[in-house]
Amino acid sequence: MSNKLWEKNFEVNKEIERFTVGRDREMDMYLAKYDVLGSMAHITMLESIGLLEKDELEKLLAELRHIYQLCEDGKFSIEKDVEDVHSEVELMLTRKLGDMGKKIHSGRSRNDQVLVDLKLFTRHELMEVVDNVKALFDELIQKSDQYKDVLMPGYTHLQIAMPSSFGLWFGAYAEGLADDMLYLQAAWRMTNRNPLGSAAGYGSSFPLNRQMTTDLLGFDSMDYNVVYAQMGRGKMERNVAFAMATVAGTLAKMAFDACMFNCQNFQFVKLPKECTTGSSIMPHKKNPDVFELIRAKSNKLQSLPQQIMMIMNNLPVGYFRDLQIIKEVFLPAFDELNDCLRMAAYIINKMEVNDHILDNPMYDPMFSVEEVNRLAAAGMPFRDAYKKVGLEIEAGEFVANKNIHHTHEGSIGNLCNDKIQALMEQSMAEFSFDKVRNAEKKLLDI
């Protein structure tokens, strides 16, 4: 027996069904508990406009809370002959409560149902991404403060350039994450808007109370225009993917630096041996596989916006099955990004730095700019000072003065980490996480 919500008086060819269902059941497992939350808000609204009796609502809510708990406990599954999570939840309600379970779809389409599922899922995952970005940020700031006076070479073109410090290096990636948080804020604002009530993209003749479901689910506002609510499918995922890719870009660059600085030719940083891997043939090897995999996974994540754009590239207004494929690249991406963020925070915490790098005379030429500046400050024209020091270097006569004195904002001697922390705290304060958590707890009666 088939359990399709749209079934009429004919059967679909089995090969067509296999191809069109694809990985929907697998992907919908990501959305299961959010489908339940959306249904709880929807039926509460239906009761308020007279489409459900109060006792029906209470029974349906109780059963939906039970299904939600099954999802939380890992005991929920989508049966083989059931198309998707929406069908499975409705089927479970109908089996338990009879015709009452068939009433929950009034004023709703699977189109706006999956839209709200995706918004609720993405909202939850963004909360975790933000928390993990903040945790990594805190580790980087701590390391920056700890090693603020330890000098290291700065590079341009991979050539020794000017003095830098571990305070600057760790702090640079911390500020990068503070900037990335602005993209996550934009992603959150777009995500935290309610599409429920747009039905198949053209609204409903039922007198739906969309503001009520918006409040029940803790959304900041709604996607007002019902056509745009459907057009937002794919656009939301793409813009969230851009935010994720921005964070991934910061991770990838940091991982490259760490791999390079860890190698024997640099020896700027050291990883505990328990955080490295070995070789099957070379007994001396201690490889920074963690950073290499963070780099690769982060580079992969940076392709996500382009994948989504190409899937939805030439779609006109309205729903198309193409949009289902976005789930396959979008939904699993959060696990990958969060895993990279957690591992980066862990490994940064364990990282040790070499505080005697500049004892090696090969780094002396990078103090040439400091000498040029001293001569210029003493009155020599800058170009003359530049030429004088350059000739000394070429003649092997340059003697490095390593007593550097930088005082301006953001320099070796004035990292401004407190300002960077203030930027991050300001960003964190603008997320409405507590509102969301409280709304969901109230809906679940916990």
Indicate where each model-derived feature is located.
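A helix-coil-helix interface module used to build multimeric assemblies
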Residues: 1-203, 208-214, 221, 277-278, ...
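Glycine-rich cofactor/substrate-binding loops
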Residues: 1-38, 99-100, 267, 282-446
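Generic, well-ordered alpha-helical scaffold segments in large soluble proteins
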Residues: 42, 63, 67-70, 92, ...
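Short, well-ordered beta-strand elements within core beta-sheets of diverse protein domains
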Residues: 44-52, 168, 238-246, 371-378
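Flexible domain-boundary/linker segments
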Residues: 60, 77, 150, 157, ...
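A general structural motif at alpha-helix termini
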Residues: 60-61, 217, 273-275, 362, ...
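Charged, flexible cofactor/metal-binding loops and thiol motifs
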Residues: 119-126, 130-131, 145, 153, ...
